[in-house]
Swiss-Prot record:
It holds the Pfam family DUF188. PANTHER family: UPF0178 PROTEIN YAII. Belongs to the UPF0178 family. Transmembrane segments: none annotated. This is UPF0178 protein Pcar_2632. Disulfide bonds: none annotated.
Amino acid sequence: MKIWVDADACPAVIKEILFKAARRTGVSMTLVANHLMRIPPSPHIHFMLVAAGLDAADNEIVKKLDAGDLVITADIPLAAQVIEKGGHALNPRGELYTVDNIRERLSMRDFMDSLRASGIDTGGPAALNQSDRQAFANRLDQFLTRHV
């Protein structure tokens, strides 16, 4: 099992939690982004630079992903592709996307997109807070305990 991180939009505090988890468990983790970023020295933590472009990181993650791998992303269409391929997807707020909930999340995303396209200001997600960080750390720990 590997961890893949959609790193372009992943909050720094979530990356720090992931770095600690990779070092603690020895699970291989790869951050995928279209710009350079620092990663701590570790045989378990890797970085993959992809070309700039719409969904370039997403496409690379889906291409490299094996069934059973975990992907960290807030991108719902990417999460849907991961689940379709037999992987697991966890967002930075600690929500595990599943076969049971991904269609609902996609429908809500599409609905919000249509509202924005018609000129309605839907606002954005709330800032990541301490309870979100804790929820992510707890869910990640639960996942790794079951799958490593």
